[in-house]
Amino acid sequence: MYLIFM
């Protein structure tokens, strides 16, 4: 779910 921060 780190893609949300990109």
Curated annotation (Swiss-Prot):
The modification N-formylmethionine is found at residue 1. Signal peptide: none annotated. Induction: Induced by erythromycin. The keyword RNA-binding does not apply. The keyword Transcription applies. Keywords: Formylation, Leader peptide, Transcription, Transcription regulation. It comes from the Bacteria. Leader peptide required for resistance to cladinose-containing macrolide antibiotics. In the presence of erythromycin (ERY) or azithromycin (AZI), binds antibiotic in the ribosomal polypeptide exit tunnel, inducing ribosomal stalling. The peptide inserts into a cavity in the tunnel, altering the positions of uracil-2584 and uracil-2485 of the 23S rRNA, which blocks recognition of the complex by release factors 1 and 2. The stalled ribosome inhibits formation of the downstream Rho-independent terminator, and thus promotes transcription of msrD. This is Leader peptide MsrDL. It comes from Streptococcus pneumoniae. The gene is msrDL.
